[in-house]
Amino acid sequence: MKSLTLHILAGVSLIAGLISCKKDTSNNTIPAVTKTDSIQVAFDPAAPNTFFSFKNDAVVANSDSATTNWDFGLRNVNFIINSHISGPGNAGVITQTGIYDSYTQAAQSGYAYDTTSTQLAIDAGFTTGWYIYNSTTHAFSPKAGQFFVIRTADNHYVKMEILSVNYVPFAGQVPVTLIYKFHFAYQADGSTTF
C-alpha cells in the first residue's frame, strides 16, 4: 500500500511539474525604438541640406556631411541618402506602399541609392514623387499609404513615414522654411524586425 501511495504521489508530482514548466518563447530581439519627430528644412533648392541621424534622433551639423554620422539629408522636397554620390555611408531606401504599422520585416536587398544628382533614391518628381503638390495652396502632402524602409549609413534598419509638410509662417511671396513631421521605427541592434 505504501508503494502504491508513493507511486501515486510521484506521478502527481511529475504531472504538476510538467504543467508548471513553460517553454520560454521570449524573443531576444531588441524592440525597435519608435519616435515621432519634426525637422525644419530650407525651402530654397540652392540652400544646404538638413541632415538627420536616426541613431541619435537628431539633426546633424552640415560640417559632418562627409561622414557616416547622418542617414538622410533634406532640402525643399528632395531627399538624399548617405551613400554612393551623396555620402560615404551604406544607406539605401525602398519606397514601400501599404500600411506602415503592418510592416514588420525589412528586406535584405532591393535598396535604391543616389546614383546621380538627378537620380535620387527617393523620387521627388511632381507626378512620380513621394508627395502630392497642390498648385492652388502650394501645399506638399505625403502620398497616403507610402513610407520608406531605410538601411542606415551604418547598416541598421528603419521604417519612416512622413506625416505632414508645412510652411513656417512667412512674409512675402516665397516661403523660407518647411517643417517635416515624420515617425519612424529604428532597430538599434541591426536586426530587420520592427
Q: Can you name each region flagged by the protein language model?
A:
Residues G17-S20:
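C-terminal motif of bacterial Sec signal peptides marking the signal peptidase cleavage site
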Residues K22-F194:
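Surface-exposed, beta-sheet-biased, low-hydrophobicity segments with strongly acidic/polar composition
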